[in-house]
Swiss-Prot record:
N-palmitoyl cysteine lipid modification positions: C19
Bilayer topology: Lipid-anchor
Function text: Together with LptD, is involved in the assembly of lipopolysaccharide (LPS) at the surface of the outer membrane. Required for the proper assembly of LptD. Binds LPS and may serve as the LPS recognition site at the outer membrane.
CC annotations in GO: cell outer membrane; transporter complex
Signal sequence range: 1-18
Gene: lptE
Region called Disordered, residue ranges: 166-193
Pfam families listed in its UniProt record: LptE
Gene Ontology annotations of biological process type: Gram-negative-bacterium-type cell outer membrane assembly; lipopolysaccharide transport
The protein's name: LPS-assembly lipoprotein LptE
InterPro entries: LPS_assembly_LptE
Length: 193
């Protein structure tokens, strides 16, 4: 009986490992991006902390921005904007529900290659109860923090597509160099949205 249980457990492990199953909230970061520089205008801000946390969860080693290594990819966090749109109103015309939209822009610089812009958008609903002002502010702060975490997850999930775009542009570059003697300048493509 014990042998059968061990055999079934081993079989279950092999099947899940063989089919590409992985833990939730983890991304297969390309091996060329396992060591990276995180560059941000606000290194201790909520987005920087969320991205740093997601990179570490996915096994990426972060180097200092001031490092002398120039062969390491760099993730540069750009502008973050949060917009609030009215989703519904009460009978008296006051706003009952907001839809909050967070847009995050970033770029990945691969040395000797190209700069790849990426972006992430996160949507959340927020109920506005005018009778509970303090609770409303606390809830809004929690929602914004969660939005930063989701935006960081989306940015990290786009790293494999950057690697694929880099490989594709290399293939296009080699095919154009063999077909024609003169090659046009490389144009980066926008990933996401």
């Amino acid at each position: 009986m014990r042998y059968l249980a061990t055999l079934l457990l081993s079989l279950a492990v092999l099947i899940t490992a063989g089919c590409g199953w992985h833990l939730r909230d983890t991304t297969q970061v390309p091996s060329t991006m396992k060591v990276m520089i995180l560059d941000s205008g606000d290194p201790n801000g909520p987005l920087s902390r969320a991205v740093r946390n997601q990179l570490r969860l996915n096994g990426v080693e972060l180097l200092n921005k001031e490092t002398t290594r120039k062969d390491v990819p760099s993730l540069r966090l750009g502008k973050v904007s949060i917009a609030k749109d009215t989703a519904s109103v009460f009978r008296n015309g006051q706003t009952a529900e907001y839809q909050m939209i967070m847009t995050v822009n970033a770029t990945v610089l691969i040395p000797g290659r190209d700069i790849y812009p990426i972006s992430a958008k996160v949507f959340r609903s927020f109920f506005d109860n005018p009778q509970m002002a303090l609770a409303k502010d606390n809830e809004q702060d929690m929602i914004v923090k969660e939005m930063y975490d989701r935006a960081a997850e989306q940015l990290i999930r786009k790293l494999p597509s950057i690697r694929a775009a880099d490989i594709r542009s290399d293939e296009e570059q080699t095919s154009t160099t063999t077909d024609t003697p003169a090659t046009p300048a490389r144009v980066s493509t926008t990933l996401g949205n």
